[in-house]
Amino acid sequence: PRRLYYAYDKDVYANQDVDDEFLKSLAEGGFQVGEFAKLCYGIGADNNVKTLEPADAVRQTKELLSLENVNIAEAAFLVGNMFVRADIIEKKGDVINLIEVKAKSWNPLEDTFVSKNGKSTNKAIRPYLYDVAFQKYVLVQALKEMFPEKNFKVNAFLMLADKSKTATVNGLNQLFKIKSAPQKRSVVEVSPDAGDIVSS
């Protein structure tokens, strides 16, 4: 949440890591995973809130949420000074699923959310749980303001890469090519074949 706040006031909070190649490569992997998740949820350009302007992003999100059933990428929610962008929102009637997509790999056969002593959360996953919990909190409060007459049931999920599984498609990552953009932020070019492969 803090990074997102700073990102919108670049004149005051300059990003010192903008030219760090290692951080850039990590971010690019995250972009690829994000695009893959959009395909998994059938999200096209019309349901992808791309604007970086917070007020406009919130307005677009509200318009999309007025539909009975919809999947949205990069939905925006603002309450007071708390602002979040949700990777994926899946709305089915009055049920809203918040899906936070992470490039982190995870083995459900070996890894757990609970530490070995069973008394706290696993340190490796804790920041992701805090992130999705904060997003859910803001989402629930924002929905009360956006749609005061509605009573939504909100669920929150983490979407992680399952490293216990083998990909059924060779070169899956090649369907999501990283391209440099003029503003120094990389973009992902999704192969036209990617949708067919993901849906099969």
Protein language model regions, located:
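Metal-dependent nuclease catalytic cores that hydrolyze phosphodiester bonds in DNA/RNA
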Residues: 1-96, 168
